[in-house]
């Protein structure tokens, strides 16, 4: 398997188009798209500004829309593709202080399920990985008591790692998942049960 890592401001449709075109130029095709850009701007709903809301949705949801739209053009011509969007259990259940993040991640699930229905006949699958509490830079800012409380709420009794999420993404990108589309795979240690 070959991969390339490119950087772009996913809030820009032009940047997303260039990102996809540059990837296609490097490999001659686009087989897998992973929508993984994500930011937070956590505040209680009453304190959240419109800018807080818009910035999170622009990156987390509109960025995935722009990238998916650009990549699907290549995938449709190939009659093959795998789209994997990284959402969150927060997109399924909500979370206090994260209305913008929850809305963006719930929207990402809807976007991906719609793409699954639109492109299944072209041998393009679209699925969601919804991580729970994962040790990342985004969760590293939490206080130790908050981290301990989160860990205690996970039936598996531990916090997940990036490798756990990567394994789910790799599975959905592979041939073994060719008949799986429109699904949400929670990688959360049982947190969402």
PLM feature segments, named:
Residues 68, 104, 112:
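Active-site helix of classical SDR
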Residues 128, 151-176, 180, 187-189:
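C-terminal helical subdomain
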Residues 88:
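Residue(s) in the substrate-gating loop at a strand-loop-helix junction
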């Amino acid at each position: 398997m070959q991969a390339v890592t490119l950087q772009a401001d996913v809030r820009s449709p032009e940047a997303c188009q260039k990102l996809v075109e540059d990837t296609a130029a490097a490999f001659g095709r686009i087989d897998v798209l992973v929508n993984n850009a994500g930011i937070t701007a956590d505040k209680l709903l009453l304190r959240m500004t419109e800018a807080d809301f818009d910035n999170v949705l622009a990156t987390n949801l509109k960025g995935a829309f722009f990238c998916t739209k650009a990549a699907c053009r290549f995938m449709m011509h190939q009659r093959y593709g795998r789209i994997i969007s990284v959402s969150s259990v927060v997109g399924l259940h909500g979370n206090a202080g994260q209305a913008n993040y929850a809305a963006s991640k719930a929207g990402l699930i809807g976007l991906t399920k719609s793409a699954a229905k639109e492109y299944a006949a072209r041998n393009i699958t679209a699925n969601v990985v919804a991580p729970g509490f994962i040790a990342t830079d985004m969760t590293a800012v939490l206080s130790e008591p908050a981290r301990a409380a989160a860990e205690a709420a996970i039936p598996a009794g531990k916090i997940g790692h990036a490798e756990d999420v990567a394994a789910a993404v790799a599975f959905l990108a592979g041939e073994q998942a060719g008949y799986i589309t429109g699904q949400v795979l929670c990688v959360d240690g049982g947190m969402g049960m």
